[in-house]
């Protein structure tokens, strides 16, 4: 499932799983991440998964790019292997004073406020990762009918 493995500087390896962002690709990234973690390969310093990439940093004194690439190329991921997913409930506040974009969304989506919220809350989302702010989820698979572009000029204060 890895499309390409290349150098990322002199002490990191970049595993590319494709350009798309979807559950299947992300699941493969996480399977490789967990498998490599379990193998405890000498010389690997850090593993960083993303939507569709896996970066592996390593200690050049213990392993080189070619040797590590060969190991990664030969890792076998069993199709039936599954990832233990966790289910999280994320509280969302829809009070008027915090719904700064609702009017813009009503106009853009041509939907009433109630329908926007109803459509949003009727679905479970896939969490691709958490990041920057502790626990900040990167959710995916938002219904096409609810998609809107970002503000041209972001708010300075929220």
Residue ranges, per PLM feature:
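Conserved "landmark" site that anchors the functional core of diverse proteins
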Residues: 1-158
